[in-house]
Regions:
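Conserved small-residue
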Residues: 1-244
């Protein structure tokens, strides 16, 4: 939960303290027949306006606002999120879709159809990125998607106190550990991306509690989100690799 500067309790219909929460849904999507729709529907994120009793802390829901995701191509599978030091909701798109299989994968085809009414319209390179939601004082939210933080299985990004450095796990088997260093504080739209190289220093086969390793960082490149988004709009999988 968070407070937002400029939030007016009377205008919001709140009698106590106005507080807000950004909520997202991962495993709670079913169709009318009760069938699991995981990954087959675009993921929503909503802003809750809550009325907090200043004496007891009790919360009451006043408003539910669905954030418009049309300008960020909808959201793929959202997972763990964090609150940025500057008060925004840092979400995730995990299990980035395989671009080579996008036209045959039933899950991605269903996602595309439910998003665009067209099984072939969704671009797999638009997903697997880091969405950020700015919560407004009137209880609404605005979405942007950062394409320059790596196309990985994002989950639970953590921004360091310098408000420029972010550590990111890759929630996937044999995934990596990534670091992003932004050009400016409170702004993830441009910066340098790194991946961790972990070197074991303790004996092979030893107890996990006795393990020791060193970490160095390999520079992957510098980019703005706009530059990577432009590439995502143009490239196809065979531009970078062949699969036999």
């Amino acid at each position: 939960m968070l407070t937002v500067a400029g939030a007016n309790a009377r205008n919001l219909g709140v009698s106590g303290n106005p507080v807000f929460a950004a909520v997202q849904f991962e495993y709670t999507t079913k169709d009318l027949a009760g069938n699991d729709m995981y990954g087959r529907l675009p993921s929503p994120i909503a802003i809750l306006t809550l009325d907090q009793n200043p004496q007891t802390g009790e919360l009451k829901l006043v408003k539910y606002h669905n954030v418009d995701m049309s300008k960020v191509y909808g959201l793929w599978i959202t997972c763990g999120a964090s609150l940025s030091p500057w008060g925004t909701h840092l979400s995730s798109e995990e299990y980035e879709p395989d671009a080579f299989k996008a036209r045959t994968d039933e899950q991605f085809k269903a996602f595309s159809k439910n998003l665009y009414s067209d099984e072939t319209k969704a671009n797999p390179y638009h997903y697997g990125h880091l969405p950020e939601i700015v919560v407004n004082a009137e209880g609404t939210g605005v979405a942007k998607k950062h394409f320059n933080l790596g196309r990985i299985s994002h989950e639970l990004i953590q921004v360091m106190p310098d408000q420029r450095t972010a550590l990111m796990g890759d929630d996937f088997t044999n995934g990596g550990l990534f670091m992003f260093v932004a050009d400016k504080v409170k702004d993830l739209s441009a910066g340098n991306l790194y991946v961790a190289k972990v070197t074991q220093k303790s004996a092979v086969g030893g107890a996990a509690a006795d393990s020791e390793f060193s970490v160095s960082w390999i520079h992957l490149g510098y980019a703005t989100s706009a530059e990577i988004e432009a590439l995502a709009n143009l490239v196809v999988p065979t531009d970078s690799m062949d699969v036999q």
